[in-house]
Amino acid sequence: MPLLHSKPTLGYLLEGEGRRIAYLTDTVGLPPDTLNWLLREPLDVLVLDCSMPPQPQVPRNHNDLNLALQCIDELQPTSAVLTHVGHTLDAWLIEHREELPGNVSIGFDGCEL
């Protein structure tokens, strides 16, 4: 699925064993066609790019937490995993992790879905 980035990037939808997992990295928001295509059936897991804490302006190439949570709200997955986490988001989460919705977690090396 096409994503929004300064270079062509694609997301992936994995379907099998009764589960739907979307893997969407290197994007800032979602193109309308991609969003609509993903909305055709519920997602079990959404793995989504989120590189920065909330920003005062719209970021370029990668989601900040505001945009990531907006995508999660639109897609309504059972669970969401934020990935492509930058140092500034990691530092922000030390003091604000409780501000994440209950179905949102932070990905890490070795994370299993």
What residue spans do the PLM features occupy?
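Cap/insert and terminal regions of metallo-dependent hydrolase folds
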Residues: 29-112
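Core dinuclear metal-dependent hydrolase active-site scaffold
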Residues: 1-33, 109-113
